[in-house]
């Protein structure tokens, strides 16, 4: 054999060490075709034959090479091993071989020692192998082959300190050479040390040097898997199969990938079939390897029934090949018990115990079967015996789990059971420490066993979702922690996903639970339990229509859903919630007749049955339905039946707590409290009972002392962080944050790494306005616990306190900490920090906002690429977050008036979340803003059909219809919304504006009356008063308007708008055109002194209002500055006007195309007699497209420009602007007044009178100047009676109005006299 043909020898050694005996045999035969007399190859062939259990053939082969000096030593050692494996041992031959071994060893060459060491290593005798290789290295003066072998021997040791030394020998063995086996050793070493880049570099060297050396590609595949790079893993697996279509490792990894990542049953089954075929053809006589390679599939097959059958069938064939192997029988028992096939499991465990009576795993499995069959006494007795054995053998997670089962089912000891479950989990995960992702990792992870533990925990968890503000049960947190690593690496496994969804549901994370269930249903649309849980989530959200839809959807996918009692139970709960108590009672009474299953674990029988916990829920729901239906006597009877039925069971306390609710509904508070007092600290539900008692003391008895006393008792009897948190929260509830702080602080000292405690302490300090202490606490706690979410809470607090630089520093430090290799949670946290940072920058570094949001979106895109592979249940939520970032970017572009970029961002948001109605609404609103009405309508129409978006869609469509001048449709849309919610003041406000703009403001009072009917408190509501104030302002009653707006001025929602309008009314009570001079010559000077005094009083009042105005938003600050300078403008004093103008110019420069600032500039220029400059600004505004938000200021700007044109005699240009005003506001009395003025100037008195009539109508006859002009034009048009009538109307309200009596009334009356 050629000395440089290291690739063939490396393959043989690799396969020998991996126990691929047939591969060894084939590779040796290939070598022997070229080197027929090579003793080393003959030895390896013999080793392969021996491994396949053809012992006599192996002995013959080994005896043939026993005389060769290179293989004599290894042949003798192998012969000894072979003889000892025989059913009948030839003692004489063994003795002869042992004496021969001593003699040969003394004179063995380095080569002989090398092969002997190899064989001992293959057989797992590490110490002996090391002894031989050390001897060989002495004899050979440091052979490189010897160093490589010594490196491998140490590398595969079970002792970590020995493994670490292996690299030294591997380095020595590969120095100045590309020894394939040595390089493989180095790559494997780096992999064990999780230096994946180093391992990949070495593996690439091997594949470059020997492209056909498959073990190197297999190693690369395993390396990519260890790095959790599934794409590269699968690609490498496919490459291996191109070279070797029956490669066992490749098919195993591809099968694992399909089971844990894709979840496609058909493909998974195909890949498992291919793995079994590869094992049966590639290694036909190797049952140990078969078992080793199929075990991971056995652990992962989950709900895939086809895969389960393939695995169980293959394991049975392995058992038939080795009928004396108790391990295979035990594994079959374990496979069946995990799939709740207890009968089959029992048979196999019995078989295992026949073969090996003291096999711990088989005994434990047998006890598990007894527990599931309800044989608790016998199981407990057996466990006592095994606990003694366990002490000598070390802890077994299965035995600890079984102890927990017995504690829960036989002795009803919740605390002991949960403590044992926790211990089982700790023992389980301790065996996985340091393991990289690999088939071995998945095998040890054993997801279905963890699901069994999780389900046991759930028996002690609340049965209903957590209410807002209530603490999450620590047990639910424990279950989430158990399942988290499973769901992370195996997101396509149904059972862990489903139980995770249950945990999220019970924790009150309803949307997260929905996302997880959605993933379950994508994997298997026929999964009954997932449909039922999804409908329960909708029920908890109050979405009864979707609850029913979900149930029917489940039926459409799987008719067996209807046979499930839970289907009818959920339906009954939905009926109860919607008030159909009679139908709910009928349904519940029907399912009460369904028999109860004995075990909680699950049902495999065909006939429907309910678990005890489900039956308890059904009875309690029936009690509730009867109570709500007024059948209290029947409710009490059913409750008593439930108490009798569940006495002494885990459901007893739950029934007791429900009985308390029934007693309370009857008003029997004392009975309720007595029942709760009967629950002792040793019983489950003790915490819930104390919480219920506390609630009664607080809300019914109004006794704060006894309320707190309940939580103090809880802390005394069940001390721990959870009880302390409840006591602290109780103090917070009664507004005693100082005492809450003491409790939180004491609990924190005992648990300095509990971030939830830090969060509460921080919130308590904020509540007591001790902001500096809160900041210090967050900063100190962050250093101790290193919890990133605390840094976000701290940054939010600093932002609230306007400490922008400090908030920026905190967030930047957190982002620097998170740099480097990131997992998904740290990336998610980084996105949160970036979004907070963008919020900070909005307040003090606007130029940085866009870049920060883009960074967040870029990072979120990377998360979305990784989530499908690692945590697929998070996809919907992460898509929503990406959409919200796009919307924030769009809003930023919108503020900058960059509409094209804004549109792109909103479309990007929709790409991330196509069905998110909020995103669709935002896009529709942008289309409306851009005047793309058809596209807006297209987006809004479907949203009208959905209840949760109907209101906003209707409001938007109403705006759209108004722009199309379809006023009736617009008003009807608002009307529909207000009929459902008359006290929706945001919509009422929009309707008042729409009625005004469509010329129907007289219809508004009817809607005010409708709102008042909802509640007697409506007239006190700030929103209602605001709407009334605006109404009175528009009908020309400024004093009434101020009275109502003042009632809304202090409100957080309506205050800013109310103050702005009040200031404008004070500065301009007659709603004149500021700067307009066309009508000034018509106004007499007789009252100029009193008019000036009135103006000054208005300015003083406006300034006083602004001194009490404290806006929190940036837009509010801008509004305040604008109003302060409008006060200066209203004085009409040149110095003040110039100061105001300077401010307006600054504002217009700061905010591109700011319409309020440009209008104010124009008004200031006119007051300063700089009309051309004013006209320039107003012409800019004339080109701006109309929007609802800017409507008022645009109308004022068009009227002011029309005034300038009127003064210059450019009536055509003025009329064009006035018609535009009327297009958007049919009630614009000023536009009609200017049109009347123009007609009057053209001596068209009839047309002038027509326009003044409309101006008089829409000013609600409140402006005497318009009345004067109308009467004058009636006089000119010889309509004397009409003129007299208008004069009387004016004089009734304004008896001293100048000139009207002499110049019009008397002349008209004189003209009527004959």
From Swiss-Prot:
InterPro entries per the UniProt record, alphabetical: ARM_TT21_2nd, ARM_TT21_4th, ARM_TT21_5th, ARM_TT21_C, ARM_TT21_N, TPR-like_helical_dom_sf, TPR_rpt, TTC21A/TTC21B
Entry superkingdom: Eukaryota
Consequences of knocking out this gene: Male mice display strongly reduced fertility. Spermatozoa show significantly reduced motility and morphologic abnormalities are observed, such as primarily tailless spermatozoa with an abnormal head-tail junction, as well as short and coiled flagella. Structural abnormalities of the connecting piece are observed during spermiogenesis and multiple structural defects of the flagella, with a greatly increased percentage of flagella exhibiting abnormal principal pieces and end pieces.
Alphabetized Gene3D superfamilies for the sequence: Tetratricopeptide repeat domain (1.25.40.10)
One of the protein's GO biological processes: flagellated sperm motility
Pfam family, one: ARM_TT21
TPR repeat start and end residues: 110-143, 214-247, 326-359, 494-527, 529-561, 565-598, 616-649, 721-754, 755-788, 790-821, 831-863, 883-916, 918-950, 951-984, 986-1018, 1022-1055, 1195-1228, 1230-1262, 1264-1297
Alphabetized UniProt keyword annotations: Differentiation, Repeat, Spermatogenesis, TPR repeat
Family of the protein in this entry: Belongs to the TTC21 family.
Assembly and interaction partners: Interacts with IFT20. Interacts with IFT52. Interacts with IFT140. Interacts with CEP78; regulating IFT20 stability and localization.
Its biological purpose: Intraflagellar transport (IFT)-associated protein required for spermatogenesis. Required for sperm flagellar formation and intraflagellar transport.
Name assigned to this protein: Tetratricopeptide repeat protein 21A
Annotated source species: Mus musculus (Mouse)
């Amino acid at each position: 054999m050629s000395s440089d043909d290291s690739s063939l020898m490396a393959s043989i050694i690799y396969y020998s060490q991996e126990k691929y005996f047939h591969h060894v045999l084939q590779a040796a035969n290939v070598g022997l075709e070229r080197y027929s007399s090579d003793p080393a190859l003959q030895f390896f062939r013999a080793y392969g034959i021996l491994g396949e259990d053809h012992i006599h053939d192996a002995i013959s082969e080994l005896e043939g090479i026993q005389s060769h000096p290179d293989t004599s030593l290894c042949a003798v050692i192998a012969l000894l091993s072979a003889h000892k494996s025989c059913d009948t041992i030839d003692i004489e031959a063994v003795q002869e071989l042992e004496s021969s071994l001593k003699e040969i060893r003394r004179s063995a060459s380095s080569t002989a020692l090398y092969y002997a060491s190899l064989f001992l290593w293959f057989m797992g005798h590490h110490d002996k192998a090391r002894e031989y290789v050390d001897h060989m290295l002495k004899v050979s003066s440091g052979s490189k082959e010897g160093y490589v072998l010594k490196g491998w021997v140490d590398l595969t040791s079970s002792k970590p300190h020995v493994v670490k030394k292996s690299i030294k020998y591997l380095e020595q063995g590969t120095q100045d050479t590309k020894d394939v086996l040595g390089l493989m050793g180095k790559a494997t070493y780096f992999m064990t040390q999780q230096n994946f880049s180093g391992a990949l570099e070495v593996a690439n060297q091997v594949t470059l040097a020997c492209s056909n050396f498959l073990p190197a590609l297999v190693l690369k595949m395993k390396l990519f898997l260890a790095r959790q790079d599934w794409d590269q893993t699968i690609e490498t697996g496919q490459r291996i199969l191109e070279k070797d279509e029956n490669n066992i490792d490749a098919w195993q990894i591809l099968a694992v990938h399909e089971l844990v990542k894709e979840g496609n049953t058909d493909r998974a089954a195909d890949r498992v079939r291919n793995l079994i075929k590869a094992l049966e053809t590639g290694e036909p006589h190797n049952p140990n390897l078969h078992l080793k390679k199929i075990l991971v599939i056995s652990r992962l097959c989950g709900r895939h029934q086809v895969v389960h059958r393939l695995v169980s069938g293959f394991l049975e064939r392995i058992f038939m090949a080795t009928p004396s192997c108790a391990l295979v029988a035990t594994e079959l028992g374990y496979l069946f018990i995990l799939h709740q096939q207890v009968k089959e499991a029992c048979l196999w465990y019995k078989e295992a115990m026949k073969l090996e009576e003291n096999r711990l795993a088989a005994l434990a499995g047998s006890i598990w079967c007894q527990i599931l069959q309800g044989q608790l006494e016998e199981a407990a007795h057996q466990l006592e015996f095994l606990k003694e054995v366990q002490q000598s053998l070390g802890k077994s997670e299965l035995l600890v789990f079984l102890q927990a089962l017995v504690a829960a089912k036989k002795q009803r000891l919740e605390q002991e059971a949960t403590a044992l479950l926790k211990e089982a989990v700790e023992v389980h995960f301790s065996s996985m420490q340091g393991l990289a992702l690999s088939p071995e990792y998945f095998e040890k992870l054993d997801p279905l066993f963890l699901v069994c533990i999780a389900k046991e925990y759930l028996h002690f968890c609340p049965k209903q979702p957590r209410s807002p503000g209530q603490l999450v049960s620590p047990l639910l947190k424990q279950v989430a922690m158990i399942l988290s690593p499973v769901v992370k690496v195996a997101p396509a496994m149904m059972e862990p996903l489903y139980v995770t969804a249950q945990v999220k549901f019970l924790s009150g994370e309803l949307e997260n639970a929905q996302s997880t269930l959605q993933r379950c249903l994508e994997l298997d649309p026929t999964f009954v339990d997932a449909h039922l849980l999804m409908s329960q989530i909708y029920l908890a959200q109050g979405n009864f229509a979707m609850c029913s839809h979900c149930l029917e959807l489940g039926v459409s996918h799987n008719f067996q859903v209807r046979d499930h009692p839970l289907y009818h139970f959920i339906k009954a709960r939905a009926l109860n919630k919607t008030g159909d108590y009679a139908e709910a009672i009928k349904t519940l009474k029907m399912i009460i007749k369904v028999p109860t299953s004995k075990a909680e674990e699950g049902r495999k029988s065909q006939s429907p049955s309910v678990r005890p916990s489900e039956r308890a829920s059904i009875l309690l729901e029936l009690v509730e339905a009867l109570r709500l239906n007024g059948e209290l006597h029947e409710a009490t009877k059913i409750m008593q039946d439930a108490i009798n039925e569940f006495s002494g069971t885990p459901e007893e306390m739950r029934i007791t707590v429900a009985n308390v609710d029934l007693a309370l509904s009857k008003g029997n508070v004392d009975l309720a409290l007595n029942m709760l007092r009967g629950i002792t600290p040793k019983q489950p539900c003790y915490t819930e009972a104390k919480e219920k008692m506390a609630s009664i003391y607080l809300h019914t008895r109004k006794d704060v002392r006894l309320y707190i006393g309940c939580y103090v008792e809880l802390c005394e009897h069940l001390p721990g962080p959870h009880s302390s948190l409840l006591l602290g929260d109780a103090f917070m509830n009664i507004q005693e944050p100082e005492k809450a702080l003491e409790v939180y602080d004491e609990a924190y000292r005992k648990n300095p790494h509990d971030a939830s405690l830090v969060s509460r302490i921080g919130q308590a300090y904020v509540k007591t306005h001790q902001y500096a202490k809160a900041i210090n606490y967050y900063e100190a706690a962050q250093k101790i616990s290193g919890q990133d979410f605390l840094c976000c809470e701290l940054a939010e607090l600093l932002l609230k306190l306007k400490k922008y630089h400090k908030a920026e520093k905190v967030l930047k430090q957190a982002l620097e900490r998170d740099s480097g290799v990131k997992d998904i949670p740290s990336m998610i946290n980084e996105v949160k920090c970036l979004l907070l940072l963008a919020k900070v920058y909005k307040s003090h570094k606007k130029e940085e906002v866009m870049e920060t949001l883009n960074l967040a979106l870029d990072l979120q895109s990377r998360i979305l690429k990784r989530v499908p592979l690692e945590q697929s249940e998070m996809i919907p939520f992460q898509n929503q977050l990406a959409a919200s970032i796009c919307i924030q970017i769009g809003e930023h572009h919108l503020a900058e008036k960059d509409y094209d970029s804004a549109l792109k961002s909103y479309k990007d948001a929709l790409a991330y979340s196509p069905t998110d109605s909020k995103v669709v609404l935002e896009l529709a609103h942008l289309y409306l803003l851009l005047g793309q009405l058809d596209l807006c309508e297209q987006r809004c129409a479907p949203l009208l059909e959905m209840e949760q978006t109907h209101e906003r869609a209707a409001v938007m469509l109403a705006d759209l219809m108004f722009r199309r001048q379809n006023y009736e449709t617009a008003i009807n849309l608002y009307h529909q919304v207000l009929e459902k919610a008359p006290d929706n003041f945001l919509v009422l406000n929009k309707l008042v504006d729409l009625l005004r703009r469509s010329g129907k403001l007289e219809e508004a009072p009817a809607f005010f009356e409708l709102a008042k009917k909802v509640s007697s408190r409506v007239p006190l509501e700030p929103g209602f008063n605001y709407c009334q104030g605006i109404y009175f302002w528009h009908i020309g009653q400024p004093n009434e308007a101020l009275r109502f707006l003042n009632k809304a001025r202090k409100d957080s929602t309506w205050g800013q708008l109310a103050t702005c309008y009040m200031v404008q009314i004070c500065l301009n009570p007659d709603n004149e055109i500021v700067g307009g001079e066309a009508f000034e010559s018509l106004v007499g000077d007789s009252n100029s002194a009193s008019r000036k005094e009135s103006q000054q009083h208005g300015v003083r009042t406006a300034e006083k209002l602004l001194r009490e105005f404290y806006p929190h938003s940036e837009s509010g600050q801008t509004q305040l500055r604008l109003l302060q300078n409008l006060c200066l403008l209203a004085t009409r004093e040149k110095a003040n006007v110039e100061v105001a103008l300077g401010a307006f110019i600054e504002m217009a420069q700061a905010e591109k195309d700011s319409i309020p600032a440009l209008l104010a500039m124009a008004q200031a220029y006119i007051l300063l007699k700089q009309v051309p400059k004013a006209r320039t600004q107003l012409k800019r505004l004339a080109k701006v497209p109309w929007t609802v938000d800017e409507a008022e200021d645009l109308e004022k700007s068009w009227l002011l420009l029309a005034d300038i044109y009127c003064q210059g005699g450019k009536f055509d240009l003025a009329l064009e602007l006035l018609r535009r005003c009327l297009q958007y506001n049919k009630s614009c009395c000023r536009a009609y007044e200017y049109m009347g003025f123009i007609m009057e100037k053209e001596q068209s008195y009839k047309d002038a009178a027509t326009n003044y009539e409309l101006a008089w109508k829409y000013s609600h006859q409140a402006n005497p100047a318009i009345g004067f002009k109308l009467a004058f034009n009636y006089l000119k048009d010889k309509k004397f009676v009409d003129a007299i009538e208008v004069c009387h109307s004016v004089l009734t309200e304004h008896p001293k109005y100048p000139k009207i009596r002499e110049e019009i009334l008397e002349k008209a009356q004189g003209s009527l006299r004959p």
